[in-house]
Amino acid sequence: MMVYIMNAFDIKSTKMDVLSISLHTSDLFDLEDVLVKLGKKFQESGVVPFVLDVQEFDYPESLDLAALVSLFSRHGMQILGLKHSNERWAAVAMKYHLLFCLSHSENVKELGQVEVQKTEDGQKARKTVLITSPVRTGQQVYAEDGDLIVTGAVSQGAELIADGNMHIYAPMRGRALAGAKGDTSARIFIHSMQAELVSVAGIYRNFEQDLPDHLHKQPVQILLQDNRLVISAIGSE
């Protein structure tokens, strides 16, 4: 793996094993009872970080997230992020300074997720996640085991992650990471290249200065060649 070294710090890819807890009730008293019973186990491990899966709740208003964060914290558990198949939860996560993980479920048609049919040899094809709204500063979208298509503008400080390819049909000012699980054949296609950072299969490049005119704010594709990131104008020879 290559690491791009900057003056003050290094950027490199990493993977962490983090618990995912699926929430089945919004009743704080019921949750308190369970956490009290499990309290000793968690206290022995120190602070336990985890992602809270809120897929069973359709609307953010159905949960008192501030109370949930406080409740889990009192019992030695720290919520790192929220997981849901509806991107409206991203704004809620950002409000509480949490990460947002876009999950997959059978009822995410409003997000435009496409379950691709099996290929002729019976292998399951990649899924595609479509995001049509802007991705704002502090938000993170992750297309797990599939490709990501974004048609809304991506703000500086926002992050897009896909295990497969990435297509961004709008100005891209945030971070784009394709091939997140190591797929070196993944590519990134950007309609208007203004990204802070791009990565394919863990190989990064950040942009402290604007690219040359034939690439800056122009349609580009980004791919790996000989373990190096190559950025080229779409349509160029």
From Swiss-Prot:
Cell division inhibitor that blocks the formation of polar Z ring septums. Rapidly oscillates between the poles of the cell to destabilize FtsZ filaments that have formed before they mature into polar Z rings. Prevents FtsZ polymerization. This is Probable septum site-determining protein MinC. GO terms for biological process: cell morphogenesis; division septum assembly; regulation of cell division; regulation of cell septum assembly. HAMAP family: MinC (MF_00267). Interacts with MinD and FtsZ. Pfam families: MinC_C, MinC_N. It comes from Neisseria gonorrhoeae (strain ATCC 700825 / FA 1090). The keyword Cell cycle applies. SUPFAM superfamilies: Cell-division inhibitor MinC, C-terminal domain (SSF63848). The gene is minC. The keyword Lyase does not apply. InterPro entries: CAP/MinC_C, MinC, MinC_C_sf, MinC_N, Septum_form_inhib_MinC_C. Belongs to the MinC family. It comes from the Bacteria. Keywords: Cell cycle, Cell division, Septation.
